[in-house]
Amino acid sequence: MGKFSGAALAAIVCGAATAASCAWPAQAATSTTAASTATAAACYASSGNLYCGNAANAPIYATPGYTKPNGNPETVVDRLETTFSYFKCYVSGQPHGGGNSIWYHTYGDQTGRWGYVAAVNVWTSTDPYPGVARC
């Protein structure tokens, strides 16, 4: 684990006065290290784009869903190897494990192909994230 405890890290990322009220995504709080949790808390929107922490090796699909209309699996076109990424915009697609149907449009780290990442793999506090453009 990192140099700081969870409480100390919250104070650094969220500001000492607001650390107690800092909202952490459930995925980040339970399944990542303190360092990636800090990244998760650093999501922001700028010019309609999202910059946010995400699951390592998250799959990028050709369309915003896991399956095609005929029931076959959707094609994985690339992956996000990094744990902090750029997302151009969002769309509504198939429901996923995050309890919604928001998918973020981005390009991958392996081949540079564009596609969609399920919001469950992006450490936003709400979906769609405020300030991010709809595709």
Regions found by a protein language model. Name each.
Residues 1-51:
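N-terminal prepro-regions of secreted/extracellular proteins
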Residues 34-48, 104-135:
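Boundary regions of SH3-family modules and the immediately adjacent low-complexity/disordered segments
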Residues 57-70:
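Short, structured beta-strand/loop micro-motifs enriched in basic residues and often containing a Trp
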Residues 67-81:
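SH3/SH3-like (including bacterial SH3b) beta-barrel domains
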Residues 78-124:
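SH3/SH3-like beta-barrel superfamily modules
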